[in-house]
From Swiss-Prot:
Pfam families: Ribonuclease_P. GO terms for cellular component: ribonuclease P complex. This is Ribonuclease P protein component. It comes from Fusobacterium nucleatum subsp. nucleatum (strain ATCC 25586 / DSM 15643 / BCRC 10681 / CIP 101130 / JCM 8532 / KCTC 2640 / LMG 13131 / VPI 4355). Consists of a catalytic RNA component (M1 or rnpB) and a protein subunit.
Length: 111
């Protein structure tokens, strides 16, 4: 999995890309000129303490790892956790996040 690392890459996607909302997350995406997709994961301090933010990012990475073959190439994608995600982190299962992200990705036509 290729990740977005530079601040300029994130800013480019925020400013020029599209966004779609889910119950627990939102995605920003934009076409790139590469032969592969790149991903960025964000969980701000509004979501919760460090252990909560890290768990959220691990769940996002796991979703991408399992579904990378379904995702169209040539996209830069940022997945951002909503505050609601952090509030319910102890009650949420991977299946809930998977269902939410599947819906968001299908609506955005990335899958």
């Amino acid at each position: 999995m290729n990740t977005l690392k530079k601040n300029g890459e994130f800013q480019n996607i925020y400013n020029l890309g599209n966004k779609y909302f889910g119950n627990y997350s939102l995605i920003f995406f934009n076409k790139n000129k590469l032969e592969y997709s790149r991903f960025g994961f964000i969980a701000s301090k509004k979501v919760g303490k460090a252990f909560c933010r890290n768990r959220i990012k691990r769940l996002f990475r796991e979703y991408i790892r399992l579904n990378i073959n379904k995702i169209n190439d040539n996209y830069d994608i940022i997945i951002v956790a909503k505050k609601k995600f952090g509030e319910n982190i102890e009650d949420l299962k991977y299946k809930d996040i998977e269902k939410d992200l599947n819906r968001v990705f299908k609506n955005s036509k990335i899958i």
